[in-house]
Structure formats: structure tokens, C-alpha cells
Amino acid sequence: MKRTFQPSKRKRKNKHGFRERMASANGRKVLARRRAKGRKKLSVSSENRHKH
């Protein structure tokens, strides 16, 4: 049986990245909540610079 987590850096960036969050109203709400909570990392884009 294939496992559910099949990691891919590109998919991770495209689905959960900062630009993707900013693209929708709900995504912006996510970022606002994370800012209010004081998260060091707002999105997965905060990890490192390269899109693999």
C-alpha cells in the first residue's frame, strides 16, 4: 500500500506557499491569524529560498 505522504518541494511551495496564501481571501486570513499568534514561520515559503 502506498503511503499518504509523498514529499515534493515544488508541490509543497505551490500549495502552501506565501503567494498561494495571498491569492485567496481565506489564505490571507490564515496569514493574519499566524501573524497575530506570533508565528516565526508564516508559510512554508519562510523555510528556504529555492523552488525545486
From Swiss-Prot:
Keyword annotations for this protein, in alphabetical order, are: Ribonucleoprotein, Ribosomal protein
Q: Spans of biased composition, class Basic residues? A: 1-16, 30-42
Q: Name one Pfam family in it.
A: Ribosomal_L34
Disulphide-bridged cysteine pairs: none
An example Gene Ontology biological process: translation
Annotated stretches, region: Disordered: 1-52
Q: InterPro entries, alphabetically?
A: Ribosomal_bL34, Ribosomal_bL34_CS
Gene Ontology MF term list = structural constituent of ribosome
Keyword Ribonucleoprotein belongs to the record: yes
Please give the GO cellular component terms listed in this UniProt entry: ribonucleoprotein complex; ribosome
The family line of this record is: Belongs to the bacterial ribosomal protein bL34 family.
Q: Which PANTHER family match?
A: LARGE RIBOSOMAL SUBUNIT PROTEIN BL34M, MITOCHONDRIAL RIBOSOMAL PROTEIN 34 FAMILY MEMBER
In Swiss-Prot or TrEMBL terms, this protein is called Large ribosomal subunit protein bL34
